[in-house]
């Protein structure tokens, strides 16, 4: 059984820890802060087997150097650091090119790890799928999606469509606790979505109790995330009201997604 644990970092980052059964060697996803990872490993008496990186932003990669140095000093071994080959990330020694390989095998992890190319937030962003656990970095959030810093709306829409096609039960381990903020926007554009309104109550209760709203699931996101359902009649009507100068008579999914993302950027 694969156990997944969150380490809180900075204001709202999650660093995910992957542990197979009772193995003492674990993997971490997007360790932006080495100190919180080392504290966790020490407290749990665990060792670090490797690092999985989704994209190059500093709050996801800032801990690589200190963690690799720690492992080298304490074990004499080089720590395996996986990440997208196309992004300039210092410390990656196991570069991944999704067009050449769509999976990898990790020591101490039973299931193969599927690699998904999900450009949009950054040009070379990748995601990792381990059994039914999706580690998607800053591509898909609960009730939202990442900003387009480097990619195009078309790339992000294709990436989100790829993730939305995964089974309903797929658990979504994104890298930030942005849920309540995203839900405010979702309720603004999708005013009569009963599933969304119910989830707002659930998520608000969780956060009031100091609990995470992550992981979400693909099934839930398809029901409540406006960026996965831009042609919903209510959402299209909201877009028309916001962008009065746009002719949306024959609008397709990409057009509506693009306008939604522009709206969210200034929300």
Swiss-Prot record:
GO-annotated molecular function: hydroxyacylglutathione hydrolase activity; metal ion binding
UniProt-listed InterPro entries: Clx_II_MBL, Glyoxalase_II_hydrolase, HAGH_C, Hydroxyacylglutathione_Hdrlase, Metallo-B-lactamas, RibonucZ/Hydroxyglut_hydro
Major enzyme class: hydrolase
EC number: 3.1.2.6
UniProt entry keywords in alphabetical sequence: Hydrolase, Metal-binding, Zinc
Reaction(s) catalysed by this chain's protein: an S-(2-hydroxyacyl)glutathione + H2O = a 2-hydroxy carboxylate + glutathione + H(+)
Residues binding Zn(2+) 1: 55, 57, 121, 138
Binding site for Zn(2+) 2: 59-60, 138, 176
CDD domains named in the record: hydroxyacylglutathione_hydrolase_MBL-fold
Keyword Transcription regulation: no
Pathway the protein acts in: Secondary metabolite metabolism; methylglyoxal degradation; (R)-lactate from methylglyoxal: step 2/2
Record text on cofactor binding: Binds 2 Zn(2+) ions per subunit.
Example GO biological process: methylglyoxal catabolic process to D-lactate via S-lactoyl-glutathione
Obligatory cofactor(s): Zn(2+)
Family to which the UniProt record says this protein belongs: Belongs to the metallo-beta-lactamase superfamily. Glyoxalase II family.
Self-association state and partner proteins as the record states: Monomer.
Chain's role: Thiolesterase that catalyzes the hydrolysis of S-D-lactoyl-glutathione to form glutathione and D-lactic acid.
UniProt name for this protein: Hydroxyacylglutathione hydrolase
Encoding gene per record: gloB
